[in-house]
Amino acid sequence: MIKIATAQIDVIPGNIRENWKQIEKEIQRAREKGAHMLVLPEMCLTGYLIGDLWDQNAFLRECEAYNEKIAAASRDITILWGSCAIDWEKTNDESRPRKYNAAFAAAGGHFLTPEKGRHPFVIKTLLPNYRCFDDRRYFTSLRQEALEEGLSLEEALTPFLLPAGSETIRTGVLLCEDSWDENYSLSPMAILAKKDISLFLNLSASPFTLGKNEKRHRMLGDALSKLRIPMIYVNQRGLQNNGKTCYTFDGMTAAYDKEGTLIAEARPYEEPRCLFLFHRDS
């Protein structure tokens, strides 16, 4: 039985050092619980709605330095977290350093690389560009990266093999919108499901809107029941401002079984830490 801890931390937008302090505490708490793995939300180190901070090189270098700190803290536990990845050798459309909305994993004090991966992180595939979301303004998607590398998305989107004690879990790591694929021409979940994965892990920075959680339960329940793969969903909480509107993030971390049934859900806007027991055959 694999113990997977989650933490829906109260992310402070733009304050990497304070977010690191929270993350460091959660790593220690997960150790004390005997967890094999800790899963944290999307953009938990930097915040999500931080506007043109994404264009400040000093901020990006600080982000890189603290990603290294998280990796170093994984000496006896696997850690999966959402953060910004930077490729200083490439640029985006505005000639600024290329950035990815990414998921990192580390174990034994070192970064892990997805199966057949070209980077030591997972790149978000579907970048939202509506309401409060500005992903396409700042980040490069896996779709664009694959196109430039001459790869199909099926080749570029690969499982993450994550150590968990004496076992290894073959996971499909998703970043928020990657599971909200109803209005897209492709489904990252469907692609990963064909690659013999045992568990989906969705790292999210999903603001609260009325009825959104109910829609997520319906949407994921339908998708997972068809793919026959369970999921753990981890969302951040707190308050963030995109310069136009303030948005609350309610957490509501959840687990779904392979039938798509919601089997556990954290309380909204609170600090509950969940410990899920996962068995690949159940």
Predicted regions and their residues:
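Enzyme catalytic cores with a strong preference for nitrogen-chemistry domains
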Residues: 1-282
